[in-house]
């Protein structure tokens, strides 16, 4: 399971040209995303409440980014996803299917991909086989997203209790381990391990 259960969203000013990349910054008990958007950075600290309290997490952010950072809300969540999204006449989309970590673009991408799969492939033959195929697609898709998320925890940091505990308890999933080993296969856009559909870590990501 993924190790974090709290998110502390905030914004930072963006002066000058917008960078063409997102920063993922290791913190004492989790990591910060820093995404350049129009006129500012959208940021958030995701962390494990067993290792740091909400007030201490706010203090850590202010030490790193400045005392004026406004952080009015702490979001609590339990990471996971449903094994089935299509049961009888009910079909789940978006947060109804699960929540992994607050990666909005990845969540939107997964929702759209599920709808495309549903309408293009399975509505033409709405039977148990279509349900099973759609649920299998959903499972494979989220396994790849979990793989992608684990990359945020594979940086080698070991100077706090959170990171030491994570290293002892966590083994990188197959895809994450493969990427960290420098790429043991040629990257390709359509990943057969995701039923031939696009991966959340596509070929272009191997090049950066």
Feature map (PLM): residue ranges:
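Tryptophan-centered motif/residue detector
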Residues: 31-33, 77, 86, 90, ...
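FAD/FMN-dependent oxidoreductases across multiple families
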Residues: 38, 47-158
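Long, low-complexity C-terminal extensions of enzymes
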Residues: 120-208
